[in-house]
Amino acid sequence: MLVLMLAAAVATMVRAHTLCRVHTVRTGKVFKSNIQLQGDPLFYAFPNTFVLKNVCKADISVYLGQKVFLTIDNFESSLLPLTVPKSLAVGVPSITSAHFVSGSLVLFVISGKGYSYDYYENTWRKLEGISEPVSHISGDVCCFKGSFCLELSNNLFAYLRGGQIPGTNIYFSDNGGFSFQLMNTDKLSHLTGTLGGIFHLHSMSQVGVLMVENNLGTFHYMEYPLNHSMGIAFSYKNLLEVIMKPYQRGFMVLWNQKSILVSSNSGQIVEHVRLIDQKIFTDLDVEHANINIYSVASNAYELAFLVAEDHLYYGSQSYMGTYVIKLPHQPLWSTHTSIYFEDIGILQVLTPVADPHFAAYDFDKCTVNVQSSLMDEKLALQPCNVELLESTMINTMFTIDMNSKLKLSALMIPRKGENPTPLVMVSNPHALGFKANLNEFGNTFDGNSKYKLDIELKQQHHWGNSDFNFTASIKRHAISSVTVDIADKTLSCVDLKPLSTLISVGCDMTKKIVVQNKISACTMGILNPVQLQKNYTYTIEKEAYDPINHNGEAQDDLIVFYEYKDLGCPRLVYYDKPWKPVVELWKNGIVEEIMNAEYVISEINGLVTYSYSLTAATANCRSQPQNWSTFESDIENEEPFLWNRENYVSCHEDNKDNPLLWPNVEYQVLGGQTNNKIIFGQRNGIYTFHLSVVDPYYSYCNLNTIFSVYVHGALPVTKFQPLLTILLMVTTTLLTAWLAYAIPKQLRSEKGQRLLGFCYQILQLCLGVCFCTWLRGKLRQWLRPRRVKDQNRGKVRVAQKHPET
């Protein structure tokens, strides 16, 4: 019994000093196999190892080392080394960069050329558009659902690290690497030095360029408001690999064998990692410490690296700094060993093992439970000062549209006797601002206080407390992450990860506009909805419309098919009454408001029998307003609906380049600060309009809709000019009145008597002629029936003489 107790005690002591236990993954090798590798085996071009994780699919990874392996089950099966077909003729099959994109593709740079590999179909393809050597492909993967997030993931760069700027070619892709295009580098013309990298920094809605000159690295930015500033310079003696940490929080890791640097704000400040040693905090100088970093692992909140001197370091990365500690020693390192995070607080040490009898490699895996390892008393770490930090905002992407706001909340329960400080951070303060309040609202069963953190977010412009040059352009959509963390959290809070989510300051896809239809031509009995649904057509007269291509006048009437499914019953409008549509803004199927933004309309069939009630002068324009003629050249090129919020210029602002020269032209913008209306011409019939919101400050969405109206009450257009008709009527009336006076007076005179006698004779002659003509007509009518009867009698006699036999 005593022996058993001693054995248990020894086993407990051994476990206490062991980071992890190695187990070997070996599958599919029961029977002997003659499988041989097809193609050229790939290898990593650098002397270290690295495991690239697919951020959105946790079980899919690529191991880069002297051999390359791709797993879809987290290295839980034996694998063949990855090869590239000989038909691609890649030359030396060395990989300098790898990047996962959406779907089942991973992009590789092999010997200066780009290739894509579909790991489900096992197919390779050379990337299109890259004509010069490149060394790296960079991107920032977004894992939320939706087209907006997919668009972020599809933005990529391909570049040659170490290339001279200006001079080196940079390629970009907006379709997930299917094809690349040569980037216009005019914005980089002021930069000099060598290129350390170019990155999509979605956390700040920026493109960042790492430039190296005189052993100093500096991040430069291409978009306003950071395009005239740069990050703080840092030491850059040897080429650094750049890791973009996931979830668009702005965290980066820059490392090589002799250096490891971090940034929490997309490169604006790059600093050293802080080392914790017996409660003493110092900057980790890798070169001075005489260690060689061999493999680096990171996830959204953690960092670890394995050094060739056989030590493993672990740390957490937050906005307050990156702190690491050397874990208890255990022999782990070999030239093939690499590390990666399998989950929060779970670090995997991976070593491929060759099999002399099979082509497939096995894997030695050693799982490090970081939380358990940090409990070692020798590390002297303080316990976590927070018991709970949770919120419903995680794993959800939110949208803040123009003039909107968002409210979030989080629950915090501190450790008993502790008073931690919550921290709220946004990665893009140029676009997104917030206000936070912390309130105590009760206790747990064991007496701990509960706190609720309320956060209100809206565009930085609308808080009104930032310098104009600090805020991003309000017209341009942006992205920012929001993170809730504990400012004074200890390193032992491994399982208490920060709360983070992504905010899109942009178009709310649940919004739409609808033109109100309270009185329609169907409800008033003018049109029949049943007939409208039966392929109803109507005719537009050639005089009433212009061809869509504006090439001369219409030659024929236009027959239009009415789209009842999209348009419904037309709204009823009286032709002579100025009218404008009432536009409703809907969100998530609910009416939000009656829209008062500026918008424009266009009759989609080319009808021109309507006008506007205001001119540039009566609309109080201070510059020449835009109108549809401004965009006619683009319409001829069959471009989409072109007058929108992106190219609209208000005439109510001074514009030296476009002064008000023609104040009497039509003002063709509806809504906003004017009461402009539509005036329909003297024509009854259906009009089908396309409506587009052009106000750039109403919504980031391109809000548009189509609707129809039926104009009634117009009398037919007269064939004569009204002025000519009135002139003829007045002349005829005056002439008749004059004749009624002049004729009786003239008849009393001798000359009048002679004229009267002459007229009498003419009348008698006419009557005689008419009477004779009448008698002759009557005689013909009487004689004609008699001839017909005589002819019929003759035919009867002939028939009697010659009867049929």
Swiss-Prot record:
The keyword Transmembrane applies. InterPro entries: CATSPERD/E, CATSPERD/E_C, CATSPERD_b-prop, Ig-like_CATSPERD. Residues 17-723 are extracellular. It comes from the Eukaryota. Disruption phenotype: Mice are normal but males are sterile. Male sterility is due to defects in sperm cell hyperactivation and decreased stability of Catsper1. Disulfide bonds join 20-366, 56-143, 142-149, 384-493, 507-701, 522-569, 621-651. One of its GO terms (cellular component) is sperm principal piece. Residues 1-16 form the signal peptide. Keywords: Cell membrane, Cell projection, Cilium, Developmental protein, Differentiation, Disulfide bond, Flagellum, Glycoprotein, Membrane, Signal, Spermatogenesis, Transmembrane, Transmembrane helix. Glycans are attached at residues 227, 419, 469, 535, 627. Component of the CatSper complex or CatSpermasome composed of the core pore-forming members CATSPER1, CATSPER2, CATSPER3 and CATSPER4 as well as auxiliary members CATSPERB, CATSPERG2, CATSPERD, CATSPERE, CATSPERZ, C2CD6/CATSPERT, SLCO6C1, TMEM249, TMEM262 and EFCAB9. HSPA1 may be an additional auxiliary complex member. The core complex members CATSPER1, CATSPER2, CATSPER3 and CATSPER4 form a heterotetrameric channel. This is Cation channel sperm-associated auxiliary subunit delta. It comes from Mus musculus. The gene is Catsperd.
